[in-house]
A protein has these predicted regions:
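Interaction-mediating elements
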Residues: 1-129
Length: 129
C-alpha cells in the first residue's frame, strides 16, 4: 500500500500526467508486488517560485517520494528504483533528473480500514518481498 507523491515544476499536459502516474504505479506493481488497483499516487505541480531545481538538473526534474510499509528487501528497492527510472525515461524524463526517496514506516504507524493499525489487519499481500 504505497502512498506516493510525485513533485514537478514543469507543467505537463493531463495525458502526460496520467502517463507519469502510470509509470510509477507499474514500477511499484513490478518491484514491490503491489496489488492491482492499489494506486495511491498524488501528482503535484509547483510554480517555479515554490520549487528549487538543483544545479545541473533540467526543467524535467522530478521527485518521487514513496511511503511504504517497513520490510521490503534491498533487492526489491533496487528493482523499484530501476523500474521507476526506466518507466519515466519512456516519458522523456532523463535518469539524472529523477530523485526517489523511500520512507519505510512500521505497520503500527499506519491507520487503515477505519483507523485500525495496519499490523492488526490482513493486508492481502506480503510486505517482505
Amino acid at each position: 500500500m504505497p502512498l506516493t507523491k510525485i513533485e514537478v515544476c514543469k507543467r505537463w499536459l493531463p495525458v502526460q500526467v496520467q502517463t507519469i502516474i502510470e509509470a510509477v504505479y507499474l514500477a511499484q506493481r513490478e518491484a514491490l508486488k503491489v496489488l492491482e488497483g492499489d494506486r495511491q499516487i498524488r501528482f503535484v505541480e509547483h510554480c517555479p517560485e515554490h520549487f528549487h531545481i538543483p544545479a545541473g538538473k533540467s526543467g524535467n526534474y522530478t521527485v518521487v517520494e514513496i511511503n511504504i510499509f517497513l520490510g521490503r528487501s534491498i533487492e526489491a528497492k533496487r528493482a523499484l528504483y530501476k523500474a521507476i527510472v526506466r518507466n519515466l525515461g519512456r516519458v522523456g524524463i532523463d535518469p539524472s533528473d529523477i530523485l526517489i526517496v523511500l520512507h519505510e514506516i512500521p505497520l503500527e504507524n499506519w491507520g487503515i480500514q477505519g483507523g485500525v493499525l495496519a499490523s492488526e489487519v490482513d493486508l492481502g499481500f506480503k510486505v517482505n518481498v
